[in-house]
Amino acid sequence: DSDSKKLLSVKKLLPVKAGEAGLRQSDAVFHHTKQLPEMFGRLFSEYGGKADITAIGVSFRPRNIDGSYMPCFLCGEGLADCMGAAMGIPVMKTSHQIGHILAALFSADKLSHINEPFIAFHVSGGTTDCLYCEPSENELIKVTEISTSLDLKAGQLIDRAGLMLGLRFPCGAELERLSDNASETVKARAVMKNGCCCLSGFEN
């Protein structure tokens, strides 16, 4: 809420069966569709009544590049478009990646960085990128990939290692708890090729 400066967030992990490393897109679409109404109910319950919404922001694809597409993004985009049309308010669309970058800037109280070039690292289950970010007239920020992982992404590596240990996906939190009690530290170095990393060797 830009007037009260109130910021609310509700979230719920999508269910993944034990031993599996994620969801198929068809299952992800189903669970997004099923859980979105519940999330909206919780959000407005925590807000405390009817909200005077003046705009909607939504991630409609993974990255702002041609061909970037995942079906599960249609769930949020469709709901945002319906709400925008019904309420007569603008729907502002951006990528999932830019959403992560802006969230990091906001949490660090550095949103002013969108007015100047900066470097961002996007490290997740599907992405391990070094990104050059700069102001843009056509987008919130323009993102150019400098370096990436050529095989496994960092989050994939963590989850695969966790599943080998019998942990439940997503494995990051449980793996971190195990590491707190580790008896030794093992150093490992990623293979680099033309400035990009290869992480699959860690799994082996």
Regions found by a protein language model. Give the residues of each.
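Conserved phosphate-binding catalytic cores of ATP/NTP-utilizing and phosphoryl-transfer enzymes
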Residues: 89-119
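Short, acidic/small-residue loops that bind anionic groups at enzyme active sites
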Residues: 78-100, 149-151
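N-terminal phosphate-binding loop and adjacent alpha-helix
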Residues: 15-45
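Short beta-strand segments
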Residues: 57-59, 95, 119-124, 131
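A short helix-loop
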Residues: 1-9, 114-116, 122-123, 129-204
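Short beta-strand-loop/turn "lid" adjacent to the catalytic site in phosphate-handling enzymes
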Residues: 41-81
